[in-house]
Amino acid sequence: MVNVTVTFTITEFCLHTGVSEEELNEIVGLGVIEPCENETASWLFDDHAAIVVQRALRLRQELALDWPGIAMTLTLLEENDRLRQENRLLIQRLSRFIKHP
């Protein structure tokens, strides 16, 4: 199976997601997304960054949050997901030691 990573220039990313370059600068500055590491001075973004921005835009529209609020919300949602996965793993490990009737 081949993994294909799509990358976007700043202009392509803005057109694809609907954010302005100013908003993109703020989003990157807040750490919501990061440009792909590359050798050139211009930013490139992958498809995961586009998904995160689309999720952020839904939060902005539905909850009327500003970008710092969105950054905090996304961080907390990611932490919640990570803790749920860790909890599932620990429950699986623990179930080996518990006798079921």
Swiss-Prot record:
InterPro entries registered for this protein in UniProt: CbpM
Signal peptide, first to last residue: none
Top-level taxonomic group: Bacteria
Pfam families reported in the protein's UniProt record: MerR_2
Coiled-coil ranges from the UniProt annotation: none
Reported function: Interacts with CbpA and inhibits both the DnaJ-like co-chaperone activity and the DNA binding activity of CbpA. Together with CbpA, modulates the activity of the DnaK chaperone system. Does not inhibit the co-chaperone activity of DnaJ.
HAMAP family linked: CbpM
NCBIfam families from the UniProt entry: PRK10265.1 (NF007617)
Family, per entry: Belongs to the CbpM family.
Record protein name field: Chaperone modulatory protein CbpM
Organism: Citrobacter koseri (strain ATCC BAA-895 / CDC 4225-83 / SGSC4696)
Lineage: Bacteria, Pseudomonadati, Pseudomonadota, Gammaproteobacteria, Enterobacterales
